[in-house]
Amino acid sequence: MDYRKILQERLNQEIENLSISIETKNSLQNAIWGSLSFYTCLPIDILNSVPDSKKYLDQVIELSVSSSFYLVSLIMVDKLIDNQEKVNGAIVEYLFFVKEEAIKKLQNLFFNNTLFWKTFQSLKCLVFSASQCRCKDFEGDNEKLLTILLNKSALVKLYVVSMKLIVQEQIDWDNILESLKSFHIAFQLLDDYEDLKEDIRSGQLNYYLAQEKNVDSESEEVEVQLKKLMATEIVENGLMIARKNACLAYKAFGKMSMKHSQQVSSVLVKEIDFVLTDIHLLKIKAEAKAKLSNVLVKNNQLNIALLRSKAFIYNNQEIDGSWKDFLTLAGDGHNWITAFVISMFAEFEDNKKDLKKAMAWLGENGGKYNQNVFSND
């Protein structure tokens, strides 16, 4: 039976009754039924795998409402704090909301249950600890890395603990936990890919950055580091692991009649496939550029002109060496088009002024000739 409509009506009513602004209500609705809908529907999805599901429906709906409020509030408060100068009023609303509504609902549901509250506190500590990890401090193998990253979503285990307390029937809880683990591996690896730029700047622990030991977040530009990662197979391999786990979750959820979880897993597979296709096309483009840039100049007169150009540029470059990237990545002695153009600039006296203008422009832009080798430009 599809209990989603019942849950949706109840959540809409609960949100409408909250003493918060319309804007806040709308943001809650969007989060609950948007990016976090997997967790919103997880309790009723698990309920669908229970033979006699109707007798547990009321309590499970209560669990869905309270857990949705808590999880969405927790995540949105965290995002708001990052922009607190602009949204102080909204932060106050959400903090009040978490304390007075979400926690209160959980207390009403599991007031005297020691197991629930001990598990709750323990999992919250895991989430907090994982969120504080930084790439520069990480030491360990791939298994340890995944364990820490999965702790970011550790609260999902509380759904299973809660459902076991409500549903007094023997169902395959271990299989549910294993399926959730597969889903979250896929979700985390895709999320880390999407957050690469942000995590390079912040230094937050990221699956791909933790494996690339040659990345120096303190001395290199973000785009340069992204190119390093793309040039290796770290990102592609990680996303293949993500795809494998998303497919495992899709099959497992389907066998347990967890339709919404299966649907979200299907969307996850498609999103990963899209990224993998995009990366593959970018690599083909980069390889094509590399081949074109490695055509050796074999004309002696052009080589002589190129040497003059090289000498001119070296003599006129800034102390910071901003043209070094141009000379190396453009391919000193390679790519006859580049060679011809810069030779013509440097060979004739009248063109030196234009060359200086070009150098000034490149200098302002860091002299990065191959800046967009992995872009769609």
Segments from the language model and where they lie:
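All-alpha helical catalytic cores of prenyl diphosphate-utilizing isoprenoid enzymes
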Residues: Y3, L7-E16, L28-L42, L63-S67, ...
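Solvent-exposed loop and edge beta-strand segments that line ligand/cofactor-binding
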Residues: K25-L36, A90-I91, L95, K144-L149, ...
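Long, hydrophobic/aromatic-enriched structural stretches that serve as scaffold segments
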Residues: I32-N83
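Well-ordered alpha-helical scaffold segments within catalytic/enzyme domains
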Residues: P43-D52, E101-F110, Y159-Q168, L248-A252, ...
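Extended, well-ordered alpha-helical scaffold segments
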Residues: L63, I91-Y94, L115-L123, N175-S179, ...
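Acidic, Mg2+-coordinating active-site segments of isoprenoid diphosphate-utilizing enzymes
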Residues: I75-E101, V161-E169, K181-E233
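Primarily interfacial, aromatic-capped hydrophobic alpha-helices that serve as membrane anchors
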Residues: K104-F128, V215-Q262, N365
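Preference for long, amphipathic alpha-helical scaffolds in soluble/luminal domains
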Residues: K285-D377
